[in-house]
Amino acid sequence: IFVPGILICQFYMFIRGKGHRRKQRKRAVGVVTGILSVSLFMSGCGAAVEPEKRMYPMALGVDASEEGICLTYGMPDLSESTGQGKEEEDGGSRVLQISGADFTRIEKMYDQSQEKLLDMGHLQVLVMGRTLVEDGRWRMVLDYLKQEIFVGEDLYVFEAEDAGEILNWHGEDNSSAGEYITGLIRNRMSGGNITAVTLRELFYEKYKEDKILRLPIVKIRNGSLEVEV
């Protein structure tokens, strides 16, 4: 508010100096009051939500379900995603699953049942269930993510028999599926051993050919996550 306040004062002095009639002064006071009110309102609207009041999914799984679709949100270690040095109290599951008829319904159910703001800006991995890929509902998934302005298009996309199962996996060091897959892909890419598929590439292929690219397969084998290309 400090900088806008200075500008408002300067603006007021300018208007005051331009005329000496009472009507002009009243008009200037009205304009300044309006600007100050808007500044105060905008500063309130722009207040940031504290990190501990946000949920930061690093991975998102999308499966077919009896209701329609099932979203699985996979969170990393809170201390890493927020820098607060706070760990999950139970040291266990950091996964949330919600099923609904469509994405709009699922978002509404999330808002009604969760106290934390959903922050999709940290999403790095998307896992789509095989049923959605085969029956064409992958288009619905891409359309949903396209309108999510905070979702980055450089996230990695995979296919799995059961996306929810993948996101419920935890490593021996309690690492989440999102953390493990991201690290694995980046290590392989740095060595030139893998070519990942990104959300940006899927968007391009969808709007160019209305097709989906062949996705790397992620699966659990003997308790370990494996990625097949």
Predicted regions, residues:
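Glycine-rich phosphate/adenylate-binding loop
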Residues: 20
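Membrane-proximal alpha-helical signals and transmembrane carboxylates
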Residues: 2, 6, 10-15, 23-229
